[in-house]
Amino acid sequence: MKQLLEFIPLILFFTVYKLYGVQQAAITLVIATVIQLIVLKVLYKKIEKSQWIMGIFVVFFGILTAYFNDLNFLKWKVTIINGLFAAVLLVSQFVFKKPIIQMLLGKELKLPTNVWNRLNLGWAGFFIICMLLNIVISYYFSDDVWATFKTFGFTGLSLIAAIATGVYLYPHLKNVENTNEQA
């Protein structure tokens, strides 16, 4: 349910963009994102930091996009967000010496340090790839291609990255379960 709720503003943006253009799509995205945050707060009693960050960026860049009737502002948002997420992951690992993914999920998952490090680097790499893809598609393809790729391409890539994470973690989770059963 939560993942579907997070996907709704994007689908609304894409639909309105195709039917009515950039300005109306940006306004729809901003309104849908604010409603989404309210619904998340009501249903789950909590809004994650990443959701707040995304919400603030969407509202800020969405308003700029609507005001100037220029899709480039939302294109920049995608690049900045992916770069920011990659930077946070890399700084957590190389400056603070503890992967942020471990800080977020360490209570639920007990994994060796090297697995956390690889997982953190894998997701940092994913965000860097998304950032670079967004730059290329933004500058070398039409706005329609960008909007379609933003809606469906990045969603597909995120799904693939999540599945790859599960496949990578599966053997390590079995090892942790076996260790717990022996104890």
UniProtKB/Swiss-Prot annotation:
GO terms for cellular component: plasma membrane. It comes from the Bacteria. The keyword Ribonucleoprotein does not apply. Its main location: membrane. It is a multi-pass membrane protein. Keywords: Cell inner membrane, Cell membrane, Membrane, Transmembrane, Transmembrane helix. The keyword Transmembrane helix applies. Plays a role in cell envelope biogenesis, maintenance of cell envelope integrity and membrane homeostasis. This is Inner membrane-spanning protein YciB. It comes from Actinobacillus pleuropneumoniae serotype 7 (strain AP76). The lineage of its organism: Bacteria, Pseudomonadati, Pseudomonadota, Gammaproteobacteria, Pasteurellales. The gene is yciB.
